[in-house]
């Protein structure tokens, strides 16, 4: 019997679009209005809004909120695993993203959103690997050219 997927998660591509200032302010106002007894959903909404920001600091704050929700609310743990993985992905912390994503997939292997994120993660790691190889190759060529140039100058000065 195939396990049916039940979690409702944002598509991983949602991380690519930046939250509007108006939407962020609306969520932040709701969060502030509920002080000191903030509902779990409002805290979650703020975390998601922060992660969709273009500010690394905001993304880190959102990640921290998701981790707090994960710790304090067992009923939202699977959902939080996904958003923690997505947050790490946005921060380009791919190993951490993979770790949380694997935790989620071990509990919910049929999650379409998690499987999409897994593919995006693979593509990002592959792309970074290629970029890394190009950078290293460029550095090797530069060093070789510099050594060649220095050797030529050194040996050309030695001749009588």
Swiss-Prot record:
It comes from the Eukaryota. The C-terminus is required for mitochondrial localization, while the N-terminus is necessary for mitochondrial fission. Belongs to the FIS1 family. GO terms for biological process: mitochondrial fission; mitochondrial membrane fission; peroxisome fission. It is a single-pass membrane protein. Residues 151-160 are mitochondrial intermembrane. The lineage of its organism: Eukaryota, Fungi, Dikarya, Ascomycota, Taphrinomycotina. Its main location: mitochondrion. It holds the Pfam family Fis1_TPR_C. This is Mitochondrial fission 1 protein. One of its GO terms (cellular component) is mitochondrial outer membrane. The chain crosses the membrane at residues 130-150. Residues 1-129 are cytoplasmic. Keywords: Membrane, Mitochondrion, Mitochondrion outer membrane, Repeat, TPR repeat, Transmembrane, Transmembrane helix. InterPro entries: Fis1 (IPR016543), Fis1_cytosol (IPR033745), Fis1_TPR_C (IPR028061), Fis1_TPR_N (IPR028058), TPR-like_helical_dom_sf (IPR011990). It is found in: Mitochondrion outer membrane. PANTHER family: MITOCHONDRIAL FISSION 1 PROTEIN (PTHR13247:SF0), TETRATRICOPEPTIDE REPEAT PROTEIN 11 TPR REPEAT PROTEIN 11 (PTHR13247). TPR repeats lie at residues 78-111. GO terms for molecular function: lipid binding; molecular adaptor activity; protein-membrane adaptor activity. Has a role in mitochondrial fission. Has a role in outer membrane fission but not matrix separation.
């Amino acid at each position: 019997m195939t396990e049916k997927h039940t979690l409702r998660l944002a598509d991983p591509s949602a991380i690519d679009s930046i939250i509007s200032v108006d939407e962020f302010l609306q969520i932040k106002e709701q969060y502030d209005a509920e002080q000191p007894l903030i509902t779990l959903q409002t805290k979650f909404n703020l975390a998601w809004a922060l992660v969709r920001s273009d500010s690394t600091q905001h993304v880190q704050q959102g990640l921290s909120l998701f981790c707090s929700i994960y710790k304090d609310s067992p009923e939202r743990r699977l959902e939080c695993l996904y958003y923690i993985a997505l947050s790490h992905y946005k921060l380009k912390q791919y190993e951490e993203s993979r770790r949380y994503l694997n935790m989620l997939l071990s509990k919910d292997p049929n999650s379409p959103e998690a499987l999409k994120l897994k593919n995006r993660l693979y593509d990002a790691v592959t792309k970074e690997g290629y970029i890394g190889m190009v950078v290293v190759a460029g550095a090797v060529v530069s060093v070789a050219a510099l050594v060649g140039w220095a050797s030529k100058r050194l040996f050309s000065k030695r001749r009588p």
